[in-house]
Amino acid sequence: MAINAQEISALIKKQIENFQPNFDVTETGIVTYIGDGIARARGLDNAMSGELLEFENGAYGMAQNLESNDVGIIILGDFSAIREGDVVKRTGKIMEVPVGEALIGRVVNPLGQPVDGLGDIETTGFRPVETPAPGVMQRKSVSEPLQTGLKAIDALVPIGRGQRELIIGDRQTGKTSVAIDAILNQKGQDMICIYVAIGQKESTVRTQVETLRRYGALDYTIVVTASASQPSPLLFIAPYAGVAMAEEFMYQGKHVLIVYDDLSKQAVAYRELSLLLRRPPGREAYPGDVFYLHSRLLERSAKVSDDLGGGSITALPFIETQAGDISAYIATNVISITDGQIFLQENLFNSGIRPAIDAGSSVSRVGGSAQIKAMKKVAGTLRLDLASYRELEAFTQFGSDLDAATQAKLNRGRRTVEILKQPLHKPLPVEKQVVILYALTHGFLDDVPVDDILAFEEALYDYFDVHYNDLFETIRTTKDLPEEAALDAAIKAFKEHSNFKS
């Protein structure tokens, strides 16, 4: 067989022309230190701040400190298998979490991985955990109410969709209960809820999940948990993962309620990471950017313009105080970022006033414009009346010689305090709140003994459900009070029918 040199030459030339180099160039570094959820690596000269980095054992970290000699990395997950000398490589990506409808009803960690034992989550969508907040022109003013189902909040410190309302108080004052009741009340309201548990005991998170499941609220809720036993980087990243999941729904035109329980523990985790990364400590050893830690998170909650779908994220961040000190560093930071605060007092809680809301220290800066007309009419003077009662009550400690007007104010105040009490996990629809507050402010409860107020309230709802459900329906559909004469007649008919009199 003759060998044709020209054919061989042409074949080799063609193969050289068609040759595609098949290799991957990745910038790598070497781990020089590992411990306490922190790694330092040398050789990653082009790493970006916030970039996701991969260790050779498959663990991931996030670049935080970009220094001249090395990169400070927080490790997202278990770091026990990482050793000094291990290779770490750049991914060219920033951290993302899975998002979408598939997450609803599930309990996940801050990386979006399921921890409820119900199998994998099938979702194709991802969002970066850190994204810019909507700009000024991308927002709308808060105009729609978010009903929590709690009379003390919906009447005194109303919340609107797109608002950030801080819940602040000592431990064991009912902060989580307020948020869980608000989530329960969103059933049938076309709201998606996200509960972010930061640094909580796993048994506590389990209890909250079971409560949500028992009342059917898990059908529209995502639970993101970074428990107390997990490394600080996961506690730090958990709120950002939660709001990234919320943003996916907001930009689809949906409404989301997100609860951060609580941001005090996130600040402590961030302080720990910052000190381990050798960042300069400031007041109370927190780093200088601890304000930015929370502001960039809470600014992502907004009511966006119609061009962006008209959706909203309403945030209820928690801050735990020590001995009721709301002037502490982290507390004042978050108060200045949010649109108001609900202050829960330990002495009110211990005296049986639950929810233990201190009306004098609580405020909603933008929620009033979202309150429905009916509630505005019946609760307009309630806050001032309550504050006046507290003041008079303090003065009566010094003597019992009171004129009739003062005695009447005290009697009305005691009934107001009783009416604003509410059992756990029993949120009320707004129409029932309006009717009982109307009865209170128009003097129908003045002759009812204080001890019978709660029984009177329950009986009134039952009576209206049977005989005057049309009044409830009017409030529900028109968002306004029905004819006062009709409401007066209905309440008088109930009082004649019942025996709640002194």
From Swiss-Prot:
The keyword S-adenosyl-L-methionine does not apply. The record marks 362 as: Required for activity. It is a peripheral membrane protein. It is found in: Cell membrane. Keywords: ATP synthesis, ATP-binding, Cell membrane, CF(1), Hydrogen ion transport, Ion transport, Membrane, Nucleotide-binding, Translocase, Transport. InterPro entries: ATP_synth_asu-like_sf, ATP_synth_asu_C, ATP_synth_asu_C_sf, ATP_synth_F1_a_nt-bd_dom, ATP_synth_F1_asu, ATPase_F1/V1/A1_a/bsu_N, ATPase_F1/V1/A1_a/bsu_N_sf, ATPase_F1/V1/A1_a/bsu_nucl-bd. Its EC number is 7.1.2.2. ATP binds at residues 169-176. One of its GO terms (molecular function) is ATP binding. The keyword Transport applies. GO terms for cellular component: plasma membrane; proton-transporting ATP synthase complex. CDD domains: ATP-synt_F1_alpha_C (cd18113), ATP-synt_F1_alpha_N (cd18116), F1-ATPase_alpha_CD (cd01132). It catalyses: ATP + H2O + 4 H(+)(in) = ADP + phosphate + 5 H(+)(out). NCBIfam families: atpA, PRK13343.1. Belongs to the ATPase alpha/beta chains family. Produces ATP from ADP in the presence of a proton gradient across the membrane. The alpha chain is a regulatory subunit. F-type ATPases have 2 components, CF(1) - the catalytic core - and CF(0) - the membrane proton channel. CF(1) has five subunits: alpha(3), beta(3), gamma(1), delta(1), epsilon(1). CF(0) has three main subunits: a(1), b(2) and c(9-12). The alpha and beta chains form an alternating ring which encloses part of the gamma chain. CF(1) is attached to CF(0) by a central stalk formed by the gamma and epsilon chains, while a peripheral stalk is formed by the delta and b chains. This is ATP synthase subunit alpha. It comes from Streptococcus pyogenes serotype M1. The lineage of its organism: Bacteria, Bacillati, Bacillota, Bacilli, Lactobacillales.
